[in-house]
Regions:
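Residues lining hydrophobic/aromatic ligand-binding pockets adjacent to catalytic sites
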Residues: 1-318
Length: 318
């Protein structure tokens, strides 16, 4: 439990969604640069206190660590206990499932033994390299991680983020059916990063048919990146804000910090806020900010919240 000084910094208020339908949050609460940005008061240092403080600021958050590693269920169980009723946590799917490379060193104990000899000493493995036994174990572990959040009613969507190089194809659609089968009963959200998907409206028809959530993205307007396409394929709508740093995204080999270093203006966010009001309907709208550098995702999320609440942000263009 926090001491008295810490407790004073950890109010019990839970902000809740705007109008009960529009949730605004960030794509992490523990990313290193975000922790250093000043979002957390000086006395809030322990991981559990940071999460509790976060819940006094926003009603929802994404778990980004589940993309990089298969986390133990003890983590999600603890997070479910540390967050208030009504708080929503979304989990990013393990990167291996979507075709990204996965670190062998970060695999759970015993998992490396399921790999062929030639892969056990590798730094990374990919979906196409691993045997079925290994993949099944990964799915079992990931499902077990999600269960504590689902059982407490705090699990939101499970985000499947496709790599930038993946274009529209029947094989990509078939992979989504596998995800749906492996995580039956969970809400799945799919994010495209390659512009080719925008040229195939049948992809949205497929998502709607399979009750998969289409994730809208706010990215720089560059030839290879997915544009902002307004669409809703489920009663939940999701938009993820990655920033509009053209130089960072256009630069080959740019670091994460270089790409996501962007501070939105109220005018840039206003059209999305208006869209949130239209799309929420009887479902839910999630506005998730991923521009973590210098804490911009939190400050921008707050601006967005004032816009959807109908309160004009000071200093914005009328």
């Amino acid at each position: 439990m926090p001491d008295r000084a810490q407790a004073a910094l950890l109010p019990d208020e839970f902000p809740g969604p705007v109008d009960g339908r529009i949730y605004v949050g960030t794509c992490s609460w523990a990313e290193k640069s975000f922790v250093k940005s000043g979002f957390y008061p000086p006395g809030v240092r322990r991981p559990e206190d940071r999460l509790r403080y976060y819940t006094t600021q926003f009603p929802t958050v994404e778990i980004d660590a589940s993309y990089f590693a298969l986390l133990p269920p003890a983590y999600s169980r603890r997070w479910a206990e540390q967050t208030p009723p009504g708080f929503v946590m979304h989990a990013k799917a393990f990167g291996l499932f979507t075709g990204h490379a996965a670190s062998v060193q970060r695999l759970p104990p015993g998992f490396a033994a399921l790999l062929p000899d030639r892969l056990r000493e590798s730094e990374e493995v990919r979906f196409s390299d691993v045997p079925e036994e290994f993949l099944n174990a990964c799915w079992d572990h990931f499902r077990a991680f999600l269960d504590p959040l689902a059982l407490t009613g705090k699990l939101g969507y499970v985000l499947f983020q496709l790599p930038p190089g993946v274009k529209y194809s029947p094989e990509a659609l078939e992979a989504m059916l596998v995800w749906k089968q492996e995580l039956a009963g969970r809400r799945l959200a799919v994010e495209f990063r390659n512009r080719d998907w925008a040229a195939h409206p049948e992809a949205l028809d497929f998502l709607a048919q399979e009750r998969l959530i289409y994730v809208m993205v706010d990215l720089p307007d560059l030839p290879r990146l997915m544009p902002a396409v307004e669409a809703m394929t489920d009663d939940w709508a999701v938009v993820r804000f990655h920033g509009r740093n053209r130089a960072g995204w256009a630069r080959a080999g740019a670091t994460t910090e270089q790409r996501y270093d962007y501070d939105y203006t109220a005018d840039e966010l206003r059209p999305w806020a208006e869209m949130a009001g239209r799309m929420a309907g009887s479902g839910r709208f999630f506005a998730m900010f991923n521009n973590h550098v210098r804490g911009n995702m939190a400050s921008n999320a707050r601006v967005f919240q004032t816009l959807v609440e109908g309160r004009e942000e000071p200093g914005s263009t009328p």
